[in-house]
Amino acid sequence: MTRNIAIIGGGIVGATAAYYLSRNGHQVTVFDEGTGQATSAAAGIICPWLSKRRNKKWYRLASEGAAFYKQLCKDVQEDGGDASFYTVSGAVLLKKTAKATQEQYEIGLKRREDAPEIGDLKILSKEELTTLLPSIQTQENALYVAGGARLDGDAMVREL
């Protein structure tokens, strides 16, 4: 049964909801003021797995959201669209001490059991870090997360 559905807000959440509802045959109208978009302001870093926030509900939401992008990209491509708005590029987490870097590494290993999209984790030497990011010359403690990604929210909204 086709329904007429109104969505308030055309950022990444509203656009994604509209995309999937339309994909399932519903008539969708998106209402959006177009100013003050969080989607446009966000850096688009997708790497929630190493957060030290104690809020388990937040972590679950963020982690499952990160995992969802793979399916969204697959669906967009199946529909003949361009999913280049999402790129798995890896992420580098900088820490002040080797101990803090090791702690983050251990958190990542544990969380990877339930979130394989984290990918490989590697504590970087200073030389590896400066090779990867030449503009960082004074940092010595870093953790590489292969599954870290970048989302261009504006491009995603336009594509959906």
What are these regions (language model features)?
Residues 22-42:
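Glycine-rich FAD pyrophosphate-binding loop
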Residues 3-29:
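N-terminal Rossmann-like FAD-binding beta1-loop-alpha1 element of flavoenzymes
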